[in-house]
């Protein structure tokens, strides 16, 4: 399974999963249809599935046009998003499995950004290959999603689930927010040398127009303040020793950054 990253809108990423042997594809969070249709035409591939993480328009905006072009495809989303995802046919529960070609993804319930948000995790096929995590707007490179429908406690629980995955997991988040996220991270975790190093690397990449997605989960655990709420330096920065309160205060600062 090849993952093809497609740029969309102003800062979105759409992910096309392609099986070159069967010449079929699935798409994760099609913000718009045109980039997907263009890539499918280049591959001469049939689209068989849409995997939506949540209902926001910049993740489902392309659903209807893709359905019109490929009427046989199936649209997957969280069960609690029923009525909010265009064309949804499959209503996923936590722990469900979804299959694309020979790969099977675990459905992880990650409320916080929205009340129904899910992530799709494809475990590694061999010991030396990475797993693939499609996490929508729950976990970003260097950050996390705003809390529109969920609570800090829910988001901490959700991020704890994602944080427990193998460190070599590739994190395919849906936006190119990394540079600004790391600028904020330095404001609350300025002594973190791994973070300083990552910021410099990302700044160089973005100045050259290079994407910073995917990232590696192990790097996120060292540098992303929204996975580090137990760290004394971060707790001190927001004057709290409670993990959920620490997270909530960091999130509040980021909302105003």
From Swiss-Prot:
Gene3D superfamilies: Ribonuclease Z/Hydroxyacylglutathione hydrolase-like. The keyword Ribosomal protein does not apply. It catalyses: an S-(2-hydroxyacyl)glutathione + H2O = a 2-hydroxy carboxylate + glutathione + H(+). SUPFAM superfamilies: Metallo-hydrolase/oxidoreductase (SSF56281). Disulfide bonds: none annotated. Zn(2+) 2 binds at residues 58-59, 137, 175. Transmembrane segments: none annotated. Zn(2+) 1 binds at residues 54, 56, 113, 137. Binds 2 Zn(2+) ions per subunit. HAMAP family: Glyoxalase_2 (MF_01374). Belongs to the metallo-beta-lactamase superfamily. Glyoxalase II family. This is Hydroxyacylglutathione hydrolase. It comes from Trichormus variabilis (strain ATCC 29413 / PCC 7937).
